[in-house]
Amino acid sequence: MPNIKSAIKRVKTADTRNSRNASQRSAMRTAIKKFDEAAANNADNAKDLYVEASKKLDSAVSKGLIHKNNAARNKSRLAAKLAK
């Protein structure tokens, strides 16, 4: 544990951000998994789940969780699965 006051605060804020980022990342991954499952089963709600997953990916980019090219690649792959 750090002794300097500013370092103590940095540890606290890092923990807060880490937990927030982890929940965002988890929600993004869950949305992608739900879409993959629906697309594999040719479910009726696959289009809605695709839109939801795309929103989660865009949100992750705006929050700095993933790179914009990573999101674009994932969205492209999801769209290809939806088209099949």
From Swiss-Prot:
Region (Disordered): 1-28
Domain of life where this protein originates: Bacteria
InterPro entries the record matches: Ribosomal_bS20 (IPR002583), Ribosomal_bS20_sf (IPR036510)
Gene Ontology, cellular component aspect: cytosol; small ribosomal subunit
GO biological process: translation
Molecular function per GO: small ribosomal subunit rRNA binding; structural constituent of ribosome
Alphabetized UniProt keyword annotations: Ribonucleoprotein, Ribosomal protein, RNA-binding, rRNA-binding
Species for this entry: Listeria welshimeri serovar 6b (strain ATCC 35897 / DSM 20650 / CCUG 15529 / CIP 8149 / NCTC 11857 / SLCC 5334 / V8)
PANTHER family: 30S RIBOSOMAL PROTEIN S20, SMALL RIBOSOMAL SUBUNIT PROTEIN BS20C
Name of the protein in question: Small ribosomal subunit protein bS20
Disulphide bridges, residue numbers: none
Function: Binds directly to 16S ribosomal RNA.
Family recorded in the similarity comment: Belongs to the bacterial ribosomal protein bS20 family.
Gene: rpsT
